[in-house]
Amino acid sequence: MGACRIQYILLVFLLIASHWTLVQNIYCEVSRTLSLEDNPSGTFNWTSKAEKCNPGEFCQETVLLIKAEGTKTAILASKSCVPQGAETMTFVQYTAPPGLVAISYSNYCNDSLCNNRNNLASILQAPEPTATSNMSGARHCPTCLALEPCSSAPSMPCANGTTQCYHGKIELSGGGMDSVVHVKGCTTAIGCRLMAKMESVGPMTVKETCSYQSFLHPRMAEIGASWMPTSLWVLELLLPALSLPLIYFP
């Protein structure tokens, strides 16, 4: 009888300990960043302060990077506690070089201070500079990245392989962000597809609006055009399985 009572007490203790582990508060790094950087892979410091989260919350870190050749790189980054999610690490390239490049990284995790990435060196693998011989002298586009409309953007030559001049803006909200980036430049995307029609990046909602001038159809211009993606690949790390499936959308 005594042995059974001891086993019962141990079982209750284990259940209480397990429940406490599931609902305990964790600490997460918290920050919001909107900036334009010359060399984000080498100079951007993503170190953040820590805050205690509510019971059951996860940590997250998300960054969206947009780059135009010959300009700075726009960085929109968020670290915070989030009320729900699954432990997942995701890298997405929405638009590939040459021309405008848009990529994102997002990490959801469930350990204290697990959203502790402090730089972008392993996230932003800068494409090789396009050789002058690969530039098409007949194709030029106004090119800029700015936090406000850039009406006087300089006209720059486009690399072979680009398909149109892009002129638009990316609006992000949620995850502590409420920001707009204005984008102009040559691109390989078709239509209004710098973000490949994706509507969220981590906890942030994305809205893309644009006009564009196709090199094949110069008079084509559309706001919020709907096209199928030309290049989008997702590298997803599901923890703790540590599997790395690669998904490609032709």
From Swiss-Prot:
Pfam families, A to Z: UPAR_LY6
Domain UPAR/Ly6 residue range list: 141-215
UniProt-listed PANTHER family: CD177 ANTIGEN
Subunit structure: Interacts with VAMP3. Interacts with LY6K. Interacts with DPEP3; co-localized on the cell surface of spermatocytes, spermatids, and testicular spermatozoa, co-localized only in cytoplasmic droplets of caput and corpus epididymal sperm. Interacts with ADAM5.
Propeptide position ranges: 225-250
GO terms, biological process: basophil activation; binding of sperm to zona pellucida; fertilization; flagellated sperm motility; regulation of cytosolic calcium ion concentration; regulation of flagellated sperm motility
Primary localisation category: membrane
Tissue-wise expression: Detected in testis.
Protein name as annotated: Testis-expressed protein 101
Keywords: Cell membrane, Cytoplasmic vesicle, Glycoprotein, GPI-anchor, Lipoprotein, Membrane, Secreted, Signal
Known function: Plays a role in fertilization by controlling binding of sperm to zona pellucida and migration of spermatozoa into the oviduct. May play a role in signal transduction and promote protein tyrosine phosphorylation.
Underlying gene: Tex101
Membrane topology designation: Lipid-anchor; GPI-anchor
Signal peptide: 1-25
Family annotation (InterPro entries): Fert-Immune_med_protein, LY6_UPA_recep-like
Post-translational modification: N-glycosylated; by high mannose and/or biantennary complex and/or certain types of hybrid oligosaccharides; possesses different oligosaccharides chains according to its subcellular localization in the testis. Sheds from membrane raft by ACE and released from the cell surface of epididymal sperm while it passes through the caput epididymis leading to disappearance of TEX101 on spermatozoa; is essential to produce fertile spermatozoa.
